Amino acid sequence: MKFKLYWWEVFRWFSDTPSRSSERACEASRQVQHIKKDYVSYKCLVPSLPKHSWQAIILYMNTRLNNFVFIIYWSVLECKTSIYLLNILNKLGLIVSVPGKSFSSPKLLINIRSFFNGNKRLRIMSQSNPYNIWLYPLNILLSFPVHRKPKKLRSTEKIFEKNGFNCENREYPHDKNDKTYFVSGKSSEEELVRIERMNQKLAWIEATLNDLDNWKRYYSLSSFSFEMGDIPEEGQSSLSVEGESDSIVTTIAYESIGLVPRSITRTLSRFKTELTGQSSSLVLYEFRLAKYQALASLQYLGCLILIPWGISFPSERWLLKPWIKNWWNINQFQIFLNYFQEERASKRLQEVEELLWLDEVMLADSSSSEVQSQDLNRQIHDKTIQLVAMYNEDSIQTILHLLTDIIYFAIPSASFISGKKRLAVMNSWIQESFHSLSDTMKAFFILLLTDSCIGFHSPHGWEILISSLSKHLGFAHNKHIISCFVSTFPVISDTVFKYWIFRHLNRISPSIVATYHAMNE
């Protein structure tokens, strides 16, 4: 019985999917209306807002608008798909029965399609239909007996007649002893009222989307991209109208660095807002903007890390590796990928021969010198085959690593190019997070980074890094190249970093520079 109840709950949840998805889409359409109203209210505050604040408002509202539009379209697609599947189930037929009863008498079936696709009849189906037997566990639950013409059905006929249903010629069982069972989680009146409400919601959603298209057309908004311009003057739209897209100037979402520190301009802007009495209306906006910046930055950073790994790892294992093995072992006759591998293999083979020859000399016997010579040749031959197989696999792995690295770096590069606005938001969030720290914490992180990369203890770490990278790419370990790199790169990095401290950090926050020098000493 528990198993049957479980399947009935699943069936009932699935039958409520159209109503649930339409309600979700309707709620998203209401949020779209609120966003449009918020845009009008924020537009009145434009003269008192700095330029970067207005641009951030537009970017934030456009992102929320795109999210709600996506929810609407996804919910409508879910609604249509569930209705289509319910119609398929209806064509197969649903039987209503009671445990222990035979499948000999006609039973009453509510046609699901009549609720979702405009079919205007209730259908009487015989239980002798063999395609209905498999639905027995779904139909024996929540059934209630009715005799002949049920009262629920009599009152339902009025609703059906109002909607154009013809219920006069309906035939019912004439045997009073024969029972008919009506399966439905709700009564027919409730179902029809629910369908009417769902139709009203779908009509509201359609009207909202049409109005949104006109609104975006008027303000030259696109569904998934937005070009931000200068702050509009009074009586002028903040978004350029169609035909004026050439005059739009694309800007970034964070404050640019100028001669005057940003803290001073931000303080003056807040003081002006307090004087005009409009500070309370910006509290909610600032909270939403900070939340949006943090979530968007973390999502973008997670995508930059996880998506390249998620694509390169399956590609390396199931696509690239079999293809490279087949191509290298069949179409290529060489074993070594470059001269360095061949030189390493020759040295390794020479070492193996010397060791085997030394073992034979130590165990030499004058009576069996010819047999020992044959054994030595056979051992050298076996070791040579092992080395060839090992370096052949090494060549395959080198090619595989090279292609995987190209994929791993190509995907973030494409993300940087296509997601410039997301990158600008993440840049703004990182800068704001860094500048919100205390001077001591800022100096600590700067000192930790510089000592890790260009400190006195870093040359050994650079040697390990360069040797691992050269081995990964199939090159030999060259001490001269590594020493040259370690002796020049940290010096250049230290020079660039000191120039950045002198040029940028000393102008933004002199206290950080003083704290940094004090900690460094």
From Swiss-Prot:
It holds the Pfam family CemA. It catalyses: K(+)(in) + H(+)(out) = K(+)(out) + H(+)(in). GO terms for molecular function: antiporter activity; proton transmembrane transporter activity. Keywords: Antiport, Chloroplast, Hydrogen ion transport, Ion transport, Membrane, Plastid, Plastid inner membrane, Potassium, Potassium transport, Transmembrane, Transmembrane helix, Transport. It is found in: Plastid, Chloroplast inner membrane. It is a multi-pass membrane protein. The chain crosses the membrane at residues 68-88, 294-314, 399-419, 446-466, 481-501. The keyword Cell wall biogenesis/degradation does not apply. One of its GO terms (biological process) is potassium ion transport. The keyword DNA damage does not apply. One of its GO terms (cellular component) is chloroplast inner membrane. InterPro entries: CemA. Belongs to the CemA family. Contributes to K(+)/H(+) antiport activity by supporting proton efflux to control proton extrusion and homeostasis in chloroplasts in a light-dependent manner to modulate photosynthesis. Prevents excessive induction of non-photochemical quenching (NPQ) under continuous-light conditions. Indirectly promotes efficient inorganic carbon uptake into chloroplasts. This is Potassium/proton antiporter CemA.
